[in-house]
């Protein structure tokens, strides 16, 4: 039998650390969660509100679109408003086509942003491409800002792709078009990074990303980048889609890559429902990292799926209530109860796995299943502490969870 260590996550790939407005990406630092607004950046009120919501949800970096003069002019005002709210969240400027001009024409914007995102596929075309790319890099050097060279297969450098396709056609054993496209994505990122360094931007100011919309392609291009460079890597499945499909696709793709030690910051690109909550993408990113054991953001609530033994909905409602209460209270608890994000709660529906799972949790309850005695044993720190009975079992257990948090994690604050 193979040692169990063989199945543990691979050691994190060694990468160069990049400081993004005080948040370290790469260099062995915890994998950073980031997100992006979908507001018109020129609408300062809406953008500030959404950045604040994303940051409160746990986004450590927030990207905003900078697509025209009005957007660029709004950036320093957005930054100032956020600071007045007590939110020193690094803002990343997302530039396409005219980034070189916007940064030059709006120096306050260039200074206010914590990082610039450049797309090699549309930074410029033909003879203007390298010149306009260089202008952005020179601005990054002037303002001491990092950049992300963000390649996306939807806007891939067509000159590079054509050259590689022509070269492949002449090969004795040509690759598939999909394989050549992957190679073009990787080369675009690496060639752009090399050019940035040649211009004078140090490696500890460069992050790379290769965005695709298919799971296997994301695994391939990021594995290739990891083999060929030590740049910090940003992971994300672009156009992942809506709802369950987007969550599953992003989780499958990034989970595999992260398990192999690759990735320094992640963004889950979910298409929100009309008027939906943008913070959902932050929650999913956190949950990917937490369920894989890489970071802890929020207490875990383990709950059984239910079966014929659990015809009552009490355990489902209780699990949902506790999860909702945790999310609602975490902004306060995170400050008031250091370490609370490591808490494990179990809400189980019958005697089969209920007691065992509850013992594994910090605090757990095994509710009675169909035909079982109407009593619910509660386990605290692996031992049976008491048994709840009567019509208020759910409310009583919720109170016990809060009491446990106050006693266990509140003591840390007092001791400090």
UniProtKB/Swiss-Prot annotation:
It holds the Pfam family GcpE. Disulfide bonds: none annotated. InterPro entries: Dihydropteroate_synth-like_sf (IPR011005), IspG_bac (IPR016425), IspG_bac-typ (IPR004588), NO2/SO3_Rdtase_4Fe4S_sf (IPR045854). Its cofactor is [4Fe-4S] cluster. GO terms for molecular function: 4 iron, 4 sulfur cluster binding; 4-hydroxy-3-methylbut-2-en-1-yl diphosphate synthase activity (ferredoxin); 4-hydroxy-3-methylbut-2-enyl-diphosphate synthase activity (flavodoxin); iron ion binding. Converts 2C-methyl-D-erythritol 2,4-cyclodiphosphate (ME-2,4cPP) into 1-hydroxy-2-methyl-2-(E)-butenyl 4-diphosphate. This is 4-hydroxy-3-methylbut-2-en-1-yl diphosphate synthase (flavodoxin). It comes from Rhizobium leguminosarum bv. trifolii (strain WSM2304). The lineage of its organism: Bacteria, Pseudomonadati, Pseudomonadota, Alphaproteobacteria, Hyphomicrobiales.
């Amino acid at each position: 039998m193979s040692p169990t260590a063989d199945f543990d996550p691979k050691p994190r790939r060694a990468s160069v650390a990049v400081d993004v407005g005080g948040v370290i990406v790469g260099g062995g630092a915890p994998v950073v969660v980031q997100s992006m607004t979908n507001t018109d950046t020129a609408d300062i009120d809406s953008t500030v509100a959404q950045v604040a919501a994303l940051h409160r949800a746990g986004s450590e970096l927030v990207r905003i679109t900078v697509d025209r003069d009005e957007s660029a002019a709004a950036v320093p005002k957005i930054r100032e408003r956020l600071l007045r709210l007590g939110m020193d969240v690094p803002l990343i400027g997302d530039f396409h086509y005219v980034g070189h001009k916007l940064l030059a024409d709006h120096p306050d914007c260039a200074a206010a942003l914590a990082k610039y995102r450049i797309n090699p596929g549309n930074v410029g075309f033909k003879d203007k491409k390298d010149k306009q790319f260089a202008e952005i890099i020179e601005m990054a050097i002037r303002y001491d800002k990092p950049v992300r060279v963000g390649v996306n297969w939807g806007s891939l450098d067509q000159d590079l792709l054509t050259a590689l396709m022509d070269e492949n056609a002449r090969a004795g054993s040509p690759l598939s078009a999909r394989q050549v496209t992957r190679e073009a994505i990787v080369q675009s990122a690496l060639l752009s990074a090399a050019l940035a360094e040649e211009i004078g931007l140090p490696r500890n100011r460069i992050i790379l990303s290769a965005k695709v919309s298919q799971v296997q392609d994301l695994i391939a291009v990021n594995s290739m980048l990891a083999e060929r460079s030590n740049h910090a890597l940003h992971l994300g499945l672009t156009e992942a889609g809506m709802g369950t499909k987007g969550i599953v696709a992003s989780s499958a793709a990034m989970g595999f890559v992260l398990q192999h030690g690759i990735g320094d910051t992640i963004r889950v690109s979910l298409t929100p429902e009309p008027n939906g909550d943008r913070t959902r993408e932050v929650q999913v990113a956190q949950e990917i990292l937490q369920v894989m054991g890489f970071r802890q953001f929020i207490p875990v609530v383990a709950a059984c799926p239910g079966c014929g033994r659990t015809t009552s909905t009490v355990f489902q409602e209780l699990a949902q209530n506790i999860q909702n209460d945790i999310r609602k209270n975490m902004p306060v608890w995170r400050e008031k109860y250091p370490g609370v994000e490591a808490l494990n709660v179990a809400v189980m529906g019958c005697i089969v796995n209920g007691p065992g799972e509850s013992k594994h949790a910090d605090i757990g309850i095994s509710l009675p299943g169909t035909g079982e005695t109407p009593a619910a044993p509660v386990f605290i720190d692996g031992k049976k502490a008491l048994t709840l009975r009567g019509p208020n079992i759910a409310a009583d257990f919720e109170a016990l969870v809060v009491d446990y948090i106050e006693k266990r994690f509140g003591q840390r604050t007092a001791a400090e």
